[in-house]
Regions:
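ATP-binding Walker
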Residues: 3-4
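ATP-dependent small-molecule kinase phosphotransfer cores
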Residues: 22-111, 183, 187
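A glycine- and Lys/Arg-enriched "phosphate-lid" helix/loop adjacent to the NTP-binding pocket
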Residues: 88-155, 159
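NTP-dependent small-molecule kinase module
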Residues: 12-14, 127-214
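Hydrophobic/aromatic beta-strand patches that form the interior of the parallel beta-sheet core
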Residues: 27, 80, 118-120, 169-171
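Short beta->alpha linker loops
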Residues: 30, 60, 84, 124-125, ...
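Walker A/P-loop
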Residues: 7
């Protein structure tokens, strides 16, 4: 959720990985490619039905994957992405009650099995996130929605964590930025070590086109 401080920590992840000698691509969703950025502008500014939001999000994601993410992974690079598919399940599925089985079908078609190795969820009560956002900028059309919408969004994120706990690392975003940064780096060190060990294994070459953390 915007206001949780994730963008700051995403940059710290990229800096740490580059310090380890990794080539890192930093991206975001919606967006990440020229076409996806144009779709992002529509999503954030134009009123539309929730199903239309979901379709635009997956259209942007499809182009993002084709244009940036898959080529980077195939080249052995890391991709760090500020938001990905979990946000569509949370905002459109949880917040706007779009059928999650339909979203899962779109996910399967667009991603063809590609998933992040690691997903960091910055968990924050909606009222705290709203107060933080109000202190720094005007709201887009999603951020302007009522607190009960963001309660549903938060529950949807929690459901995603429960369904795939090995992929997620949940961080208490009410903590200080310094503490969150320490938690994040401690986990990223482990993720990076596991990846290095896997890449060095006899089967590692076959894994080089796999997903990196998002």
């Amino acid at each position: 959720v915007n206001g949780a401080g994730k963008s700051t920590h995403v940059g710290a992840c990229v800096d740490w990985l580059r310090a380890q000698g990794e080539t890192v691509v930093l991206s975001r969703e919606p967006g990440g490619s020229p076409l996806a950025e144009r779709l992002r502008e529509l999503l954030l500014t134009e009123e539309m039905q929730p199903q239309t939001e979901a379709l635009l999000a997956f259209a942007a994601r499809s182009d993002h994957l084709h244009t940036l993410i898959r080529p980077a992974l195939a080249a052995g690079q890391w991709v760090v992405c500020d938001r990905f598919t979990d946000s569509t399940f949370a905002y459109q599925g949880g917040g706007s009650d779009v059928d999650t089985s339909w979203l899962a079908q779109l996910e399967a078609h667009v991603q063809d099995g590609l998933q992040p190795v690691r997903t960091y969820l910055f968990d924050l009560p909606p009222e705290v996130a709203a107060a933080r956002r109000a202190a720094v900028r005007s709201a887009d059309r999603f951020e302007a929605r009522a607190l009960d919408y963001f309660e549903r969004v938060r529950r949807a994120y929690q459901a995603r964590v429960a369904a795939d706990p090995e992929r997620f690392c949940v961080l208490d975003a009410t903590a200080t930025p310094e503490q969150i940064g320490r938690w994040l780096q401690d986990d990223l060190v482990k993720v990076h070590r596991r990846w290095r060990e896997r890449a060095a294994s006899p089967t590692g070459a076959a894994d080089k086109a796999g997903a990196r953390p998002s």
